[in-house]
Each structure stands twice: as C-alpha cells, then as structure tokens.
Swiss-Prot record:
Annotated protein name in UniProt: Bifunctional heparan sulfate N-deacetylase/N-sulfotransferase 3
Other observations noted: The presence of 4 different heparan sulfate N-deacetylase/N-sulfotransferase enzymes in mammals, as well as differences in their enzyme activity suggest that some initiate heparan sulfate modification/sulfation reactions, whereas other later on fill in or extend already modified heparan sulfate sequences.
Gene name of this polypeptide: NDST3
Function in brief: Essential bifunctional enzyme that catalyzes both the N-deacetylation and the N-sulfation of glucosamine (GlcNAc) of the glycosaminoglycan in heparan sulfate. Modifies the GlcNAc-GlcA disaccharide repeating sugar backbone to make N-sulfated heparosan, a prerequisite substrate for later modifications in heparin biosynthesis. Has high deacetylase activity but low sulfotransferase activity.
Catalytic activity: alpha-D-glucosaminyl-[heparan sulfate](n) + 3'-phosphoadenylyl sulfate = N-sulfo-alpha-D-glucosaminyl-[heparan sulfate](n) + adenosine 3',5'-bisphosphate + 2 H(+)
UniProt-annotated catalytic positions: 605 (for sulfotransferase activity)
Record family assignment: Belongs to the sulfotransferase 1 family. NDST subfamily.
GO-annotated molecular function: deacetylase activity; heparan sulfate N-deacetylase activity; heparan sulfate N-sulfotransferase activity
Membrane topology according to the record: Single-pass type II membrane protein
Length: 873
C-alpha cells in the first residue's frame, strides 16, 4: 500500500513538473514568436548592431531574386520621358545632366497637376523607353484616367519608372505611400550606407564596403518594406534627432532606394528617397537607367584614360620637377598599372626651356630624358607660343622643326602621331596653318582640345575630324599650373578630395568612355598633386565600380573614340566671336564681320536667281563672290565645301564698310532640301534671316527636267517627263536619281519644318514665286521690311518689264536694261496633261501640309497653292 502511495505521489510530482515545463515552453515560444513578428514589421534595436559586412543579418530579405522579365525594348524608341517640377529645378537639371553626359535622348515635360499626358505611342511603337518623375508623388497622385493610361503603356511596352520622393514638411513624416504596401519616413538625417549585393539593378556600381559618415542633407526619405515584391538597393542608418518617431528604430538600417520588381502590377519601378546630391545615389541612378531600359541606354564598362602632362621643361624656378619627383613619377606609373591596364604618362615637351630651372630642377630634366623610353611623348610648341599668333604657315613650321630637332637629339620618339597646342590655340576655332604645319613636320594624326564646341559645360565636349586630323575632347581634372600645394588647393584640400571621391572627376570617368586628362609639369613637383589625384582616383573607381580602366596610345585611342561615336566625325562650325575664349585664341587678322546676315536657300527653279539680281541692286546689300566650281553659288552648308572650314567660306565675302548697315548674303538654292544645311547654318549664323521662294511644285519639277535636258543630262534626254516622274523602284539608277531631283524639293512643308527646327519663324520669309514674277517691286518692299535694311530702295523705279524676255529687268541709265542671262527664262513646251494630273495627285498631301504650316505661321497662302487646294475638295 505504501508503495502504491509513493508511486502515486511520484506520478503527481512528474505531472506537475511536466505541466510546469510545458507552460514555461509555451511562454518562451510565445515570447519569441511575438518578437519574431515584431522584427519583421519594425526594424528592431538589434539591427543597429549590424554592419554592411554582415548583410545576411539585416532585417530584409536579401536573397537573390528575379525581377519581372523586361519586354522587347526594341518596341520603343530609345528616348527617356522626364517629368520635372519646373525647367529650373535643381534635381531636374541633375537628371538631365546625367542623360546628356551619357548621350541619351530625352524629352522633358513639366509634370502636370492635372491634364493630359503627352502622346506615348506613334504608329504602334512606344515613343519612350523609360519614364522618370522628379517628384514621384505627381505619379502616385495622378488622376485615375491618366494613371491607368500610363500604367497600361508601361505594362504593354515593358517600360519602367524611376521616381524621387521629395518631403514637403520640416518635421519627421511617417505615412503609407498610396498604392504601395510599405511605409515611408521623411525628413530624416542618415549615415553609414551600404549596397545590397543581390540587387539585380547594380552593374557599374560595386557592392564593396560601408560608406561611413553622414550623408548630405537632413531631408531623407527611408522605406520600411516587408514584401518580396520590393527589394532594397541601398541601406543607411537613421541618425537620432530629438523628434524621432517612436516607430523608427534608432541606428537601424533602412532602405533609401528600393526596387519594385514588377511582381505586383507588371511595372518595374525604382524609388529614390532623396535627390542626386549623394554620389552613390547618382551611381545607382545610372544603373537603374541601364537596367530598366533593357541595357539599351547603357555604356560599356570599359574606360580608357590618358593622362597628358603638358609643359615638360616649361615653368619658372621652384615649380618644376627634380630627380626625386621623376623617380616618384616612375614609381607611381608602375603602381597605377596594377589598376589601369597599360597605364603610361604622356609627356608634352617644349624643348626651348630645357635646363632653365634651378640646379636640382635641371637634374630633374636630365632624369626625365634618361627615362625617355618609360613614357610616351608628344610635341608642344618649341617656345610654348600659341599657334594662332603665327599668321603664316612657314613660321609655325620653323618652330616645329626646332622642337623636332631637340627630340631627335635627346632620343625622344617623334612618331606617336599626337600633339597638343599651348592653350589649345588653333585647334578650335581652326587655324588652318596649324593643321598644315602639323602634317608636314610631325605627321600628326590626333590632337585634343577642351574648347569644342565650348569649354563649359564639359558634358557637351565632342570630337571631330578636320584635315584628316582626329580631334578628341580633353578633360580637366582640377589641376592647373598654379595648383601645386595640397593645403593651398582652391577651396581647401577637401575640394580636391571631394572631386576624386564621388565628385566631378569621378563622374568624368564614369560618364565618359574615353577621357584625356590635362595636367601640367608643375602638378608633379612640390606636393605632387598629379600623382595624388590619379592614385586616389584609380583606388576609388576600383573600390566602388566594376569599370575596367585601361590606357591606349593616342592614335589607337582616337580610332576607338570614333568607333564609339561615328556621328561626331563631321565638325559643326560656330561663330568664333560668340565665345570669348574662342575669340581669344583666334587670329586677330580674322573678323566675323564677313559672315552673311541672311541666306536665300532656294529651292532651285523657283526664281532665286531673279531675286539675287534684285537684291544686289540695293546699295546696302552685298553678295558673295562667285564660286568657279559650283555654278557661282558657294554651296557651303550642303556639300563637302563645309569641311574646308569657315576661313574658306568667309573668303567669298567682302569686308563690309559699315558692319551695322551693310548686309552680306549668299544664295545657294540647294540649301532648301538639304538634310545638313539647316543645322550647320544655325550653328554658324544663328541670327541670319532665311528667305525661300515657293512656286507650284509641279511647275518646279517640270522646269528642273527641262533644265537638265538643256544641260544634256542622259536620263533627261532619254526619258520623257512622265516616264521620269512615274518611274518605279526598279527603274534604272540614273532615272531614279533624276526623278528624285525633280520631285523631292517639292515636299515644301517637310523641308520648311526642318529649317524651323533650327530657326524661329520670325527669321523665315516665304515668298510667293508667282508674285515675284509678276509684281517684283511689291515683293522686294516686303523683303526690305523683313531684313530691316536701310535706306529703303524704290524698286518700282528701278525695274522694268522686258516684253521680249518675258520678265523684269534692272533699269540702267539712258534707258538701258540689265537682264538675266540666256539660260534664264528659257521657253519650252507646256507640260502634258497626264504629267499635270499625276503631279497634282502626287503633291496633294504635301500641299495640304504646306497650307496647315503656313496657317500656323500666320503667313498668307500663295495664289498657286489656293488653286491647288480647290482641286482637293
């Protein structure tokens, strides 16, 4: 019995212990279950102890994920649609700066509070490959109709959205972003950021290490996400302000950029919690453009860097290199080769100044020449004179021969094919004598300049080819002849470091596939800022990007450049007097006054020669001298004559006796339908007035055909007019060529609109060719008013109708007349009815478009056009 009682008590004790254990287990499990739930929704205090080196413990799902598959990006044009708050907004300008630096096409719209979206689709093709909102709230709060249209477009064409959240209040904000399953906190200060290495977004950016320190600004927005459809890209810790919301964990990591993977609604989005002032945000922005465009808007990861050291042997005492500086240059070159493949400093010398420093500096000169094979070399000018100051080629040749003789005496290679002019003088604006002398003495194939098309902004710098010399853009790096001491750097040493570490110099490398950097001898003596700059730049680029840095010899580099940018081969000449820097490095013997104030652009066979005769009758209007090679017309803007340069062009014009009252002009009737002429003309003479004459395009086509017959064109003699204009695509090439010259210039609206892309409407005068033929005095009064030329010339008294010739002529003294030559006003059989009917139908749509354009411009319809439009009804 006692045994049974003992067993019973033991059993009770065991049950109580088990029950107690179960209760404790339940309590512990409940505690950890609750803690786990809380950790998923609020970033716990433990997160503050986590560093970027231990990313797997961060409170986000950081496993590698796959975003929505992008659609075929070829279904859209490679153009970015950018919605900005205003055309002057700071963030909007930063966005445009990156797009322009990357040479991506874009279209700007002011983000509408209400109203219609721009047209998104044209002929079943999407107009935009990517949409960027400077203020993402304008996208989120869009009215439902336009939002559904935009989202439908994005889904159908696989178009992504990039947006920036801008806080409007000064206090810390916390709210749910409309339509998105996560919370955001605004107006925060953050620090210590790192990159999610699993983000599918990053390409240029390397997830390497923690970026310690405070991030710029106190207006940051951070995202608290807990959904597999959203992936953080960058994290940062929230700093602890006094008014920090209780829901924000102190020192916790939050996302400052998130990637909506498109799993929810089929649209991928990248949302930024701040502007682009922070360099890492700017880098991710570049990657986001590449990713969301299906890599159609992307640059290669290869970066070619050439570091020029100008002014070798030049410089006053105390600023030059000594032996230790030269040894440091060699050591650093070897060091840089570990990070920049084939890195070699490129030394530009002026032999006249050899051994003109202190004794130690002269020894430095000798040390350089003793290591001549370790570097690349290029000629500066012998005496460091600016080439534009030499007015004849022979003087330039003499200077170059002296420098070449020095090179040969000291074993400096003379076959690199590269040269740089002091202060970039003579390269652009072009000093032809420099190009010719370079070819004769050095056989130069490449040079570089920071002046084309202008020094600033640097992102607009381009290359071109002239006289078979390839001209590449040159970049500055913040080092000039006077920047030789670290502590005395303009703005303080931090300014140089900021440029290197995510600033201007860093992004020069990121955004330019090829960079030729200008430095100077003085940057490698004293504090050796040149070495400091490029060692630290290479380290920073390697640490934070996946870019592949390398160096090529100059000629190879130039060929690589024009492989990447073949559209830059043709130069675009500008007026040197419109840029003070250009004017300063342009010969004082030249003048911009010899550029025309207006152009008569054609088209051919509309009466342009008659207009020319009437214009030169005016005492204040002067024309170009005739060209013996192109039927008296200069034909500069539309032909290869353009590559002869502006000196060649201006030589056709006289120097005006009075710049204010004299009007220079030229007539080249082929300009009208030229693809290149409008852009070229607008670049060189942007304020020039443009005059065109329009007659019935059917009559113009027939007149051109007869003109070609009179010049014994084989196709015109062989085929009838109707056979020419109605020829099919399989017709002989010579017949198709004649057909094109007959018909295409008559597409009046298309050609005028091309000119209006580059010239404002008030600079364009459209003359009714039929009225010019019947009432030239009235037309010439209109022309004088349009040009603003004085004194007013009375054409009613100066013109007389020649009934024998059939057109108006200039009335001279004693009743004599001056008329157009025998080739003008030629009579020929009337056009056959079949051809007239064919052309009336062919030009119908073109004439309708012309009427719409003239109505839009507020210009009257010519009488012939009104007659043609009546046939349309």
């Amino acid at each position: 019995m006692s045994f049974i009682m003992k067993l019973h008590r033991h059993f009770q004790r065991t049950v109580i212990l088990l029950a107690t254990f179960c209760m404790v287990s339940i309590i512990i499990s409940a505690y950890y279950l609750y803690s786990g739930y809380k950790q998923e929704n609020e970033l716990s205090e433990t997160a503050s102890e986590v560093d970027c080196g231990d990313l797997q413990h961060l409170p986000y799902q950081l496993m590698e994920v796959k975003a929505m598959k992008l659609f075929d990006a070829s279904r859209t044009d490679p153009t970015v649609l950018v919605f900005v708050e205003s055309q002057y907004s700071s963030l909007g300008q930063d966005i445009i700066m990156i797009l322009e630096s990357s040479r991506f096409q874009y279209h700007i719209e002011i983000a509408p509070g209400k109203g219609d979206l721009p047209v998104l689709i044209d002929k079943m093709k999407g107009k935009y490959i990517l949409i960027i909102y400077e203020n993402i709230l304008k996208y989120i709060n869009m009215d439902s109709w336009n939002r559904s249209l935009l989202d439908k477009y994005c889904v159908e064409y696989g178009v992504g959205v990039i947006g920036f959240h801008k806080t409007s209040e000064k206090s810390v904000q916390s709210f749910q972003l409309k339509g998105f399953p996560f919370s955001i906190y605004g107006n925060l200060a953050v620090k210590d950021c790192c990159i999610n290495p699993h983000s599918p977004l990053i390409r240029v950016t390397k997830s390497s290490k923690l970026e310690k320190g405070s991030l710029p600004g106190t207006d940051w927005t951070v995202f608290q996400i807990n959904h597999s459809a959203y992936q953080p890209v960058i994290f940062a810790k929230v700093k602890t302000p006094e008014n920090l919301s209780p829901s924000i964990s102190k020192g916790a990591f939050y996302a400052t950029i998130i990637h909506d993977l498109g799993l929810h609604d089929g649209i991928q989005r990248v949302l930024f919690g701040n502007n682009l002032n922070f360099w890492l945000h700017k880098l991710i922005f570049i990657d986001a453009i590449s990713f969301l465009s299906g890599k159609r808007l992307t640059l290669s990861l290869d970066r070619y860097i050439l570091v020029d050291i100008d002014d070798i042997f030049v410089g006053k005492e105390g600023t030059r290199m000594n032996t230790n500086d030269v040894k440091a240059l060699l050591d650093t070159q070897n060091l840089l080769r570990a990070q920049i493949t084939n890195f070699t400093f490129n030394l530009g010398f002026s032999g006249k100044f050899y051994h003109t420093g202190t004794e130690e500096e002269d020894e430095g000169d000798d040390c350089l020449l003793g290591s001549v094979d370790e570097f690349w070399w290029f000629p500066h000018m012998w005496s460091h004179m600016q080439p534009h100051l030499f007015h004849n080629e022979s003087s330039l040749v003499e200077q170059m021969i002296l420098n070449k003789k020095f090179a040969l005496e000291h074993g400096i290679p003379t076959d690199m094919g590269y040269a740089v002019a002091p202060h970039h003088s003579g390269v652009y604006p072009v000093h032809v004598q420099l190009y010719e002398a370079w070819k004769k003495v050095w056989n130069i194939k490449i040079t570089s300049t920071e002046e084309y098309p202008h020094l600033k902004p640097a992102r607009y710098r381009r290359g071109f080819i002239h006289k078979n010399i390839m001209v590449l853009p040159r970049q500055t790096c913040g080092l000039f002849t006077h920047t030789i001491f670290y502590k005395e750097y303009p703005g303080g040493p931090k300014e140089l470091d900021k440029s290197i570490q995510g600033g201007e110099l860093f992004f020069t490398v990121v955004l330019n596939p090829i960079s030729i950097f200008m430095t100077h001898l003085s940057n490698y003596g004293n504090d050796r800022l040149g070495l400091y700059t490029f060692v630290n730049l290479a380290n920073f680029v390697k640490s934070w990007t996946n870019l592949r840095l390398q160096t090529l010899p100059p000629v190879q580099l130039a060929h690589k450049y024009f492989e990447l940018f073949p559209d830059q081969k043709d130069p675009l000449w500008q007026n040197p007097c419109d840029d003070k820097r250009h004017r300063d490095i342009w010969s004082k013997e030249k003048t911009c006054d010899r550029l025309p104030k207006f152009l008569v652009i054609g088209p051919q066979k509309t009466g342009t020669t008659a207009l020319y005769l009437f214009l030169v009758m005016h005492p204040s209007i002067l024309s170009n001298s005739p060209s013996p090679k192109t039927f008296e017309e200069v034909q500069f803007f539309n032909r290869n004559n353009y590559h002869r340069g502006i000196d060649w062009y201006m030589d056709f014009f006289p120097v005006p006796s009075n710049v204010t009252t004299d009007f220079l002009f030229e007539k080249s009737a082929n300009y009208f339908h030229s693809e290149e002429a409008p852009k070229r003309a607008a670049s060189l003479v942007p304020k020039a007035k443009i005059i065109t004459i329009l007659i019935d395009p059917s009559d113009r086509a027939y007149s051109w055909y007869q003109h070609q017959r009179s010049h014994e064109d084989p196709a015109a003699l062989k085929f009838s007019f109707y056979e020419v204009i109605s020829a099919g695509p399989r017709a002989p090439s010579e017949l198709r060529a004649l057909q094109k010259r007959c018909l295409v210039p008559g597409w009046y609206a298309s050609h005028i609109e091309r000119w209006l892309v580059y010239f404002p409407p008030f600079q364009l005068l459209i003359i009714d060719g039929q009225q010019l033929r019947t009432d030239p005095a009235t037309v010439m009064d209109e022309v004088q008013k349009f040009l603003g030329v004085l004194p007013h010339y009375n054409y009613s008294e100066a013109l007389t109708f020649d009934s024998h010739k059939g057109f108006w002529c200039q009335l001279l003294e004693e009743g004599k007349t001056k008329c157009l030559g025998k080739s003008k006003g030629r009579k020929y059989p009337p056009m056959d009815s079949d051809s007239r009917t064919f052309l009336s139908s062919y030009y119908r749509d073109h004439n309708v478009e012309l009427s719409k354009l003239l109505h839009k411009l507020g210009q009257p319809l010519p009488s012939w056009l009104r007659q043609e439009l009546q046939k349309v009804r």
